């Protein structure tokens, strides 16, 4: 049940892209770049020097360079070698034992080798969210957009896009920065993503949108060290200040009304967050009075977050 050799096929072009149901726009302040399973074990199934793998690695490289320049976090997934049968579980039934314990198969391809600032997640299931802290990291950083690249398009990349959708994260599925067992499966992944859970886009178009983001948005992203102002940590600090408590004593899941956050204090937060570009209401906050829920709401409602000394 080893991965079969993949015959070359032409990487889809802009004319091959499906019609999207949504018109999402990438925001450097809200995005994370995912480089999915670009390990030697998986990449070696393609014919070296032929399409689609040549375009695949080149386009991911271009996207990564741009994301680093704009302060967008870069996340890799990589499956471990010699997995314990209990950890691998049902994957064995479909794909056999997987990678061996040798360093070559586990390694990310040289052209896309992770750098010191990149996050590498150990991958256990199709979805990059399953049994990893990707979702926790994105929420902590106040990011709700995921740029998906890598292999294989109709398996891990697509399942990750579906789970992102179910977590209210906008997935940008890059049509010529993913690859698959065949053009048919590649196109199937694009069609499903565009119609059900993601925004499909070509590399050059995505690069243009990121590059042409408003200058103040780009500056915010680069200057905040890959952070967004609407993080759980920052929200906790604001609440602690209003309650005159220590931030560490307030948890992300506790009911803030029970904690003593009254209507006057909530309206103070509403007014402050509106000034920062998040269109939220008192009723919305009162209905879901936890830091975790407020962080998700603020992230989805923020149009353009500008630096504010109150958060520093």
Swiss-Prot record:
SUPFAM superfamilies: ACP-like (SSF47336), Isochorismatase-like hydrolases (SSF52499). The keyword Plastid does not apply. Its EC number is 3.3.2.1. The modification O-(pantetheine 4'-phosphoryl)serine is found at residue 263. Induction: By superoxide. Pathway: Siderophore biosynthesis; bacillibactin biosynthesis. Pfam families: Isochorismatase, PP-binding. This is Isochorismatase. It comes from Bacillus subtilis (strain 168).
């Amino acid at each position: 049940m080893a991965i079969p050799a993949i015959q070359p096929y032409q990487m889809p072009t802009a004319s091959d892209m499906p019609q999207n149901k949504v018109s999402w726009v990438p925001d450097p302040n809200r995005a994370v770049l995912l480089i999915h399973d670009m390990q030697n074990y998986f990449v070696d199934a393609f014919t070296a020097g032929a399409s689609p793998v040549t375009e695949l690695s080149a386009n991911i490289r271009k996207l990564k360079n741009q994301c680093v320049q704009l302060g967008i976090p870069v996340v890799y997934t990589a499956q471990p070698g010699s997995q314990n049968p209990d950890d691998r579980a049902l994957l064995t039934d479909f794909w056999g034992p997987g990678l061996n314990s040798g360093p070559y198969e586990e390694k990310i391809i040289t052209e896309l080798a992770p750098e010191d600032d990149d996050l590498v997640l150990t991958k256990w299931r199709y979805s990059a969210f399953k049994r990893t802290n990707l979702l926790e990291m994105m929420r902590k950083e106040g990011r709700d957009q995921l740029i998906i690249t890598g292999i294989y398009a109709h398996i891990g990349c697509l399942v990750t896009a579906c789970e992102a959708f179910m977590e209210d994260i906008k997935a940008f599925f890059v049509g010529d920065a993913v690859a698959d067992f065949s053009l048919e499966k590649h196109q199937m992944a694009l069609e499903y993503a565009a119609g059900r859970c993601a925004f499909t886009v070509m590399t050059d178009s995505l690069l243009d949108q990121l590059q042409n983001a408003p200058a103040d948005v780009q500056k915010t992203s680069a200057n905040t060290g890959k952070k967004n102002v609407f993080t759980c940590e920052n929200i906790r600090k604001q609440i602690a200040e209003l309650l005159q408590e220590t931030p560490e004593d307030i948890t992300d899941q506790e009911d803030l009304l029970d904690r003593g956050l009254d209507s006057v204090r909530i309206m103070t937060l509403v007014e402050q967050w509106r000034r920062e570009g998040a269109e939220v209401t008192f009723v919305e906050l009162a209905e879901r009075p936890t830091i975790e829920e407020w962080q998700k709401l603020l992230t989805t409602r923020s149009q353009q977050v500008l630096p504010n000394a109150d958060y520093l």
